[in-house]
């Protein structure tokens, strides 16, 4: 049966093939095995795609079906949804269709409100995004700057390496690098130093800076210096060093007292401004004083009664609010006036308050304080009157964890309230919640809250105020110095504290700008004052060296790690950087006298400073400047030593107007003439080398000018090289005594001398036939002498223990051969 099936199938296939071949219109399609395989793969992939899609649909149905969702139903719902009706245009209505008109107006109003809100939202988002980016960039910049300032001593040292030239190229003086604020401060520094140098009564640097700040017309800066003046107006406690003085309880109490006075006076001024700005609402009247001022202020601050206030009113004003704001303005007598008028409503508080205001340290006795604290915990802590709670916490110095944000809603109010609670006595019986020390408060502000809490990029002066009023002077200055726009203020605050001996300075120059040293009390930080000053002056040293000198004078008693005066070191670097040698150090007149410079005003020992600057210039390779400075300091040995180094490379050069050689030659001749007239001399070897170099300059000048006979006479008188066989050994022995400055020029001297001999020989040979005036025997003798002199030079060149440059020997031999 199977055989019949295959046979029938074969017969049908053959018949089909025959029919196909009979149709001539259709071409034959032939495929090889590879094409058949590719076609099969394509068919298979299509089948697999459909299968995988169906499989994915099945899996999705199973997943969503397990959660109770029907895919087909969801698809139908999605297809039925349309957003066309959300913002479709309003249909036109007839003029008489009131309902349709109102509906359209309502829809229009809604759509307009939505669109306006959308635009406003996008604008706000853009502004927030931009502000956020600016803040982030500012933070990054400050971190980078802080990293640079806090790194090693040479972190910001961009000084270029000294060039190989012997004289520095100083550019033309440019415009001042100081802006108007920096220049205003610089003028005050000049006035201050003038008084100090002249020995007059030393003025207050704080007062001078305050005057400068008032002329700047910047309220933030003016307030800053008013605060600095207030905080520094404390009696200096006798102590062996600033650290002991600053950490003494008496000094810290004085700082807190001054900070409270400043905050109270500032708030009273704020109250006055608020009242006079709203006279109609304030209804100011009555006897001038704090009490009536506070009453008027409450008309603005509390225009409507606040629920929860306790213990009644006085003349329509809450009792505790009156007491609090009188205390906040620093007028305890006005607060006592309120307490006396409301004594029947306040119970025993009157006695506690009287004891508080009559104590110079604003402190209750331990018995009264414990009694008040107990009453606070039992009855007042749960009170709904925020002013009452605040007054009790201030007088009893208790519950220090409560920030009283209802009444102390500003940073200054918070500072005043917490500083009022600071205690200095060791209270063994006090619980931690009733004890706040100044170091604890300092740590809370600087470490726990920090810069991020106070938004320092928007309000840098506020954070400075927070740190400064809590006696964290060094941290406040270091923060303000990091901001470019406030850097000059930070530097001058540091100078003011430094002069008042209130600044804690770093003990090492390599310390960070703000650092803590081991073994010192926690929270004590030191400022690298020297680094601070040098970083500030670096900006304007090249353009304003006189102003920089005024600042460096503050370092006159400071020493570096090697014990050297920082004033001396800074002046040296300043002179080298600015190239203002004559202006700063003085100028040497033609008669040898010295014209004073800017440095003479600050010290009598100018010679030491000039020698130091000259040494620095010499180490940097600035030999010409160093020689002039040593000349200014009356140090002839160094003057001639450096001049010899300068002259040696240019001795054999051809002189040209305004060339390096011409300038050095004139300088050396001026020195030689002045020293000769004044009888000044240096060490014998240096002196002889100097004058020998001058003679060699004369020799080469004559030689290059073509004056053969004159140049020969010069070299013959110098007796530097032998001109006869008899003097060769003598000259070789003398060569050992010559300095390197002479030896380096020996090759050129020998070549020039040999060239002179060869020129004379050629001139002799080209002078024509023998005449009666010049017998042949004389000419032959002259030839013999020239050849003998040339041979002596060759012998000398071979005997000296010195390796001459290049092909000197070959050239000497060549010219000597030509003469034979």
UniProtKB/Swiss-Prot annotation:
Belongs to the nucleoporin interacting component (NIC) family. It comes from Xenopus laevis (African clawed frog). Keywords: Membrane, mRNA transport, Nuclear pore complex, Nucleus, Protein transport, Translocation, Transport. It is found in: Nucleus membrane; Nucleus, Nuclear pore complex. Its main location: nucleus. The gene is nup93. The keyword Transport applies. It holds the Pfam family Nic96. GO terms for biological process: nuclear pore complex assembly; poly(A)+ mRNA export from nucleus; protein import into nucleus. This is Nuclear pore complex protein Nup93. Plays a role in the nuclear pore complex (NPC) assembly and/or maintenance. GO terms for molecular function: structural constituent of nuclear pore. It is a peripheral membrane protein. One of its GO terms (cellular component) is cytosol.
């Amino acid at each position: 049966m199977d055989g019949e099936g295959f046979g029938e199938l074969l017969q049908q296939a053959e018949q089909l093939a025959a029919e196909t071949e009979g149709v001539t219109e259709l071409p034959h399609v032939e495929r090889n095995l590879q094409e058949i395989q590719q076609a099969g793969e394509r068919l298979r992939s299509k089948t697999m795609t459909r299968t995988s899609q169906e499989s994915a649909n099945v899996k999705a149905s199973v997943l969503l079906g397990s959660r109770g969702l029907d895919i087909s139903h969801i698809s139908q719902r999605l297809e039925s949804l349309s957003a066309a009706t959300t913002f479709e245009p309003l249909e036109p209505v007839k003029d008489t269709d009131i309902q349709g008109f109102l509906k359209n107006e309502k829809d229009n109003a809604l759509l307009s409100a939505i669109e306006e809100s959308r635009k406003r939202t996008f604008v706000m988002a853009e502004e927030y995004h931009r502000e956020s980016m600016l803040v982030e960039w500012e933070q990054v910049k400050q971190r980078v700057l802080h990293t640079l300032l806090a790194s090693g001593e040479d972190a910001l040292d961009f000084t270029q390496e000294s060039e190989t030239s012997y004289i520095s190229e100083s550019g033309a003086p440019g415009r001042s690098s100081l802006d108007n604020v920096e220049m205003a401060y610089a003028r005050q520094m000049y006035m201050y130093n003038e008084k100090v140098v002249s020995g007059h009564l030393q003025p207050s640097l704080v007062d001078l800076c305050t005057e400068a700040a008032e002329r700047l017309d910047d309220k933030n800066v003016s307030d800053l210096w008013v605060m600095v003046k207030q905080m520094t107006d404390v009696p200096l406690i006798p102590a062996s060093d600033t650290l002991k003085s600053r950490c003494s309880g008496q000094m810290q109490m004085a700082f807190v007292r001054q900070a409270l006075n400043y905050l109270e006076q500032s708030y009273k001024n704020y109250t006055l401004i608020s009242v006079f700005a709203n006279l109609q609402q304030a209804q100011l009247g009555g006897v001038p004083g704090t009490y009536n001022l506070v009453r008027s202020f409450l008309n603005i601050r509390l225009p409507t009664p606040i629920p929860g206030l306790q213990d009644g009113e006085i003349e329509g004003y809450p009792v505790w609010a009156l007491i609090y704001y009188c205390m906040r303005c620093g007028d305890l007598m006005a607060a006592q006036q309120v307490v006396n008028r409301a004594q029947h409503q306040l119970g025993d508080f009157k006695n506690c308050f009287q004891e508080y205001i009559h104590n110079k340290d604003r402190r209750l006795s331990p018995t009264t304080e414990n009694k008040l604290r107990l009453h606070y915990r039992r009855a007042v802590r749960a009170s709904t009157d925020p002013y009452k709670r605040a007054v009790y916490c201030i007088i009893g110095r208790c519950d220090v964890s409560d920030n009283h944000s209802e009444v102390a809603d500003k940073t200054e109010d918070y500072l005043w309230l917490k500083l009022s609670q600071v205690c200095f006595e060791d209270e063994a019986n006090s619980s931690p919640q009733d004890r706040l020390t100044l170091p604890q408060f300092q740590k809370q502000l600087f470490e726990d809250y920090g810069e991020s809490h106070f938004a320092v990029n928007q309000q840098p002066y506020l954070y400075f105020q927070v740190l400064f009023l809590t006696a964290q002077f060094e941290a406040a200055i270091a923060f303000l110095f990091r901001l470019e726009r406030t850097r000059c203020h930070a530097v001058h605050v540091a100078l003011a504290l430094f002069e008042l001996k209130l600044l804690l300075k770093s003990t090492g120059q390599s310390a960070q700008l703000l650092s803590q040293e081991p073994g010192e009390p926690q929270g004590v930080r030191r400022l690298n004052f020297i680094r601070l000053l040098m970083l500030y002056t670096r900006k304007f040293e090249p353009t304003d060296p006189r102003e920089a000198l005024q600042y460096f004078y503050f370092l006159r008693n400071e020493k570096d790690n090697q014990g050297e005066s920082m004033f001396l070191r800074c002046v040296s670097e300043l002179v080298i950087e600015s190239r203002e040698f004559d202006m700063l150090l003085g100028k040497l007149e033609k008669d040898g006298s010295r014209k004073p410079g800017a440095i003479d005003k600050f010290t009598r020992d100018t010679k030491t400073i000039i020698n130091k600057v000259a040494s620095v210039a010499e180490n940097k390779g600035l030999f010409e400047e160093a020689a002039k400075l040593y000349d200014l300091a009356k140090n002839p040995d160094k003057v001639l030593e450096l001049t010899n180094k300068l002259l040696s490379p240019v001795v054999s050069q051809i002189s040209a107007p305004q060339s390096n050689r011409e300038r050095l030659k004139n300088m050396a001749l001026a020195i030689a003439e002045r020293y000769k007239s004044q009888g000044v001399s240096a060490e014998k070897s240096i002196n002889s080398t100097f004058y020998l170099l001058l003679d060699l300059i004369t020799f080469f000048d004559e030689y290059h000018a073509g004056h053969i006979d004159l140049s020969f006479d010069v070299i013959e008188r110098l007796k530097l090289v032998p001109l006869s066989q008899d003097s060769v050994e003598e000259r070789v022995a003398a060569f050992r005594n010559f300095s390197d400055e002479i030896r380096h020029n020996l090759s050129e001297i020998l070549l020039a001398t040999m060239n002179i001999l060869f020129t004379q020989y050629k001139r002799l040979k080209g002078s024509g036939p023998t005449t009666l005036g010049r017998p042949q025997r004389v000419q032959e003798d002259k030839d013999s002498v020239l050849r003998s002199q040339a041979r002596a030079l060759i012998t000398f060149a071979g005997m000296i223990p010195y390796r001459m440059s290049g092909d000197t020997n070959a050239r000497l031999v060549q010219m000597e051969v030509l003469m034979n």
